[in-house]
């Protein structure tokens, strides 16, 4: 059956104490609403309607997509009123209502819920809690059939004793939702149009209300303040850590690992503490990542080693390559098989061939370095003249002496060597030694100045 999804994302979130709309606050590097939209897309609906209000333009700009239709709720008059704003755009056989501040909901849970909705049956996602304070209560009859949802503020003492709460996530037959929304009233403690009142209307019309529960109650946890936001973050990260460990990854401490994007992992991967993975990261078999590393949009081939306190972005490390500690690989960095980048080496838009080495204290920008070449400590590729960037190209088996400045554009042939302390401004032919430094002069009998 066809499906329309409505995501309610109009709330201000005053308890966040922020100029940023609540649904744009991030969990694992992505806005809460972004997580919900990604889950909605996984269900392959006919349309996704996003109801926005507070900070509407910010939300629209941040999350614009060809498959999203944004509907503005000018006044926040309740969840029923919010869904009503999307009514002109709903024509599918089923309508699923989601919330933009409930980022951990799983597509599998929603699939189970949707299997229970039909022309004569609604499907409601509920959760059983030890303390359901704040949740609307699920009122059932003697046969266990759902009769109504009573909001916490409107509930009697007996109703507040009910532990089964309403998550707000609801799937309804598309042919009936318009009729029910048109009959909503705001005669309640909040003076709002409650979407939950649809349940009692459906029961009165002879429809059955089926229920489903998530495997984990945290799936339906929202965030009204930064404390709850932090709880969502930590739960998301622990869930991600468990998934990685199930795929053969060793995490030294799952509580000190952050995934802020997507990662593909091989087997026998070792990740030490305080590692952050961002964007899209590919980690192949037998990779080792030391503590305190940040890796973004990068690929680590089989057996690569990232040592402590290294930062990688847009980089590729070949099989058996290693970098760090304290290495920085910026976008466009490519390390060949068994290449080595040591401490305090920065690379940008540069490639290091198979077996090549840059041991320490170097900047390699806009450079191509051939296989088995050795870059001495303190080497700088001078790639910028104040207006344009230029490349340095080295052949295979090149040896760059320590403290060399290579002024681009520059080509060094296979087997070329530069003497330590040289400033190289002209191309160096293959198998040639280049020296570009002042001649040393020793002054006999010289004495240091003394203070006066």
UniProtKB/Swiss-Prot annotation:
Transmembrane residue ranges: none
UniProt key word Glycoprotein: no
Entry's Gene Ontology molecular function annotations: glucosamine-1-phosphate N-acetyltransferase activity; magnesium ion binding; UDP-N-acetylglucosamine diphosphorylase activity
Record region (Linker): 227-247
Required cofactor(s): Mg(2+)
Chain segments carrying region N-acetyltransferase: 248-452
Residue sites binding acetyl-CoA per the record: 377, 383-384, 402, 420, 437
InterPro entries, sorted: Bifunctional_GlmU, GlmU-like, GlmU_C_LbH, Hexapep, MobA-like_NTP_Trfase, Nucleotide-diphossugar_trans, Trimer_LpxA-like_sf
Alphabetical UniProt keywords: Acyltransferase, Cell shape, Cell wall biogenesis/degradation, Cytoplasm, Magnesium, Metal-binding, Multifunctional enzyme, Nucleotidyltransferase, Peptidoglycan synthesis, Repeat, Transferase
Active-site residues per Swiss-Prot or TrEMBL entry: 360 (proton acceptor)
Compartment list: Cytoplasm
Gene Ontology BP annotations: cell morphogenesis; cell wall organization; lipid A biosynthetic process; peptidoglycan biosynthetic process; regulation of cell shape; UDP-N-acetylglucosamine biosynthetic process
Superkingdom of origin: Bacteria
Family the UniProt entry places it in: In the N-terminal section; belongs to the N-acetylglucosamine-1-phosphate uridyltransferase family.
Protein name: Bifunctional protein GlmU
Organism whose genome encodes this protein: Stutzerimonas stutzeri (strain A1501) (Pseudomonas stutzeri)
Gene name per UniProt: glmU
């Amino acid at each position: 059956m066809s499906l329309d999804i409505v995501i309610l994302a109009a709330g201000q979130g005053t308890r966040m104490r922020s100029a940023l709309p609540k649904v744009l606050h991030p969990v694992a590097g992505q806005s809460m609403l972004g997580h919900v939209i990604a889950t909605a897309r996984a269900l392959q609906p006919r349309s996704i309607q996003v109801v926005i209000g507070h900070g509407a333009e910010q939300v629209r700009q941040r999350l614009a997509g060809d498959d999203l239709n944004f509907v503005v709720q000018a006044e926040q008059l309740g969840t029923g009123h919010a869904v009503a704003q999307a009514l002109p755009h709903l024509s599918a056989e089923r309508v699923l209502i989601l919330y933009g501040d409930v980022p951990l909901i799983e597509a599998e849970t929603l699939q189970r819920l949707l299997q229970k909705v039909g022309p004569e049956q609604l499907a409601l996602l509920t959760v059983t809690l030890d303390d359901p304070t704040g949740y609307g209560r699920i009122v059932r009859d003697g046969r266990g059939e759902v009769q109504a949802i009573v909001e916490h503020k409107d509930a009697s003492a007996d109703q507040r004793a009910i532990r089964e709460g309403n998550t707000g996530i609801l799937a309804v037959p598309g042919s009936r939702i318009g009729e029910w929304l048109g009959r909503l009233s705001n005669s309640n403690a909040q003076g709002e149009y409650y979407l939950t009142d649809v349940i009692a209307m459906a029961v009165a019309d002879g429809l059955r209300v089926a229920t489903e529960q998530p495997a984990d109650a945290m799936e339906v946890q929202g965030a009204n303040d930064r404390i709850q936001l932090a709880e969502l973050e930590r739960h998301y990260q622990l869930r991600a850590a468990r998934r990685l460990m199930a795929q053969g990854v060793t995490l030294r401490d799952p509580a000190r690992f952050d995934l802020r994007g997507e990662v593909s992992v091989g087997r026998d991967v070792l990740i030490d503490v305080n590692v952050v993975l961002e964007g899209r990261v590919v980690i192949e078999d037998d990779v080792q990542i030391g503590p305190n590393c940040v890796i973004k949009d990068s690929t680590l081939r089989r057996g690569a080693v990232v040592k402590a306190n290294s930062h990688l972005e847009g980089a590729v490390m070949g099989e058996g390559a290693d970098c760090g500690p304290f290495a920085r690989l910026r976008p466009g960095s490519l390390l060949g098989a068994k290449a080595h980048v040591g401490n305090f080496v920065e690379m940008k838009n540069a490639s290091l061939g198979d077996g090549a080495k840059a041991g320490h204290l170097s900047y390699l920008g806009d450079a191509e370095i051939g296989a088995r070449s050795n870059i001495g400590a303190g080497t700088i590729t001078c790639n910028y003249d104040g207006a344009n960037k230029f490349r340095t190209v080295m052949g295979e088996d090149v040896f760059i002496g320590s403290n060399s400045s290579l002024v681009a554009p520059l080509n060094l042939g296979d087997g070329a060597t530069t003497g330590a302390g040289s400033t190289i401004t002209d191309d160096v032919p293959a198998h040639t030694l280049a020296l570009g430094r002042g001649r040393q002069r020793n002054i006999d009998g010289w004495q240091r100045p003394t203070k006066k």
